[in-house]
Amino acid sequence: MATTSKKSGSKKSKRNVPNGVVHIQSTFNNTIVSITDTSGEVISWSSAGASGFKGARKGTPFAAQTAAELAARRALEQGMRQIEVLVRGPGSGRETAIRALQVAGLEITLIRDVTPLPHNGCRRPKRRRV
């Protein structure tokens, strides 16, 4: 039998990225936190679903806080110190995710709301009658 050399998978190298951008997408059902460098390369990401929450609990502020802490911990390992925060969406986890990033040890230099607003584009879904 021929011997085969064992090939290990390509592991992400540790980069020293001192400052970056945190994108927080907060919907009513989930919160996604992506941390990128200034050119847009994703360094770490996390979401409420990836943090172990399922169903309706993904939309809670605590789930957003947990997701932000996990993403921040991975970014700190890459050497990140200063961040700009771009928040998108109407969800309940916006403020708690920002607070969790601050508590994790990242210095926030800018917070910007980039929620897309239509200039009367598509028709809205009909109102729920409960």
From Swiss-Prot:
GO molecular function, one term: rRNA binding
This protein's record includes keyword Ribosomal protein: yes
Keywords carried by this UniProt record: Ribonucleoprotein, Ribosomal protein, RNA-binding, rRNA-binding
Function: Located on the platform of the 30S subunit, it bridges several disparate RNA helices of the 16S rRNA. Forms part of the Shine-Dalgarno cleft in the 70S ribosome.
Lineage, broadest ranks: Bacteria, Bacillati, Cyanobacteriota, Cyanophyceae, Synechococcales
InterPro entries in UniProt: Ribosomal_uS11 (IPR001971), Ribosomal_uS11_bac-type (IPR019981), Ribosomal_uS11_CS (IPR018102), Ribosomal_uS11_sf (IPR036967)
Family the entry assigns: Belongs to the universal ribosomal protein uS11 family.
SUPFAM superfamilies the UniProt entry points to: Translational machinery components
Superkingdom of origin: Bacteria
Pfam families according to UniProt: Ribosomal_S11
Quaternary context: Part of the 30S ribosomal subunit. Interacts with proteins S7 and S18. Binds to IF-3.
NCBIfam families in alphabetical order: PRK05309.1, uS11_bact
Gene Ontology annotations for the cellular component aspect, listed alphabetically: ribonucleoprotein complex; ribosome
Biological-process GO terms, alphabetical: translation
UniProt xrefs under PANTHER family: 40S RIBOSOMAL PROTEIN S14/30S RIBOSOMAL PROTEIN S11
Protein name: Small ribosomal subunit protein uS11
